[in-house]
């Protein structure tokens, strides 16, 4: 199964757009509401649906292997 990472806007705060990928996807810097650190990635509601999975908890996750954006912790 693909590795998917939490990417639902409802789980994030301090969301700042920092750029776009080559394919035109918005790239954001953000913090998770319930987790320490600052991360870089996408918002699940803005990307192709084939890269979005819905977890058992009802929140979206993203299969980053289908995107030209890397998810990473930056702080």
Predicted features and spans:
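C-terminal intramolecular chaperone/autoprocessing and neck/assembly modules of extracellular spikes
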Residues: 2-75
């Amino acid at each position: 199964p693909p590795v998917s990472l939490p990417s639902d806007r409802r789980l994030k705060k301090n969301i700042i757009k920092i750029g776009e990928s080559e394919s035109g996807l918005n790239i954001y810097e953000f913090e998770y509401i319930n987790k320490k650190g600052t991360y870089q990635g996408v918002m699940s509601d803005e990307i192709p649906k084939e890269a979005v999975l819905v977890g058992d908890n009802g929140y979206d996750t993203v299969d980053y292997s289908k995107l030209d954006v890397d998810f990473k912790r930056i702080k």
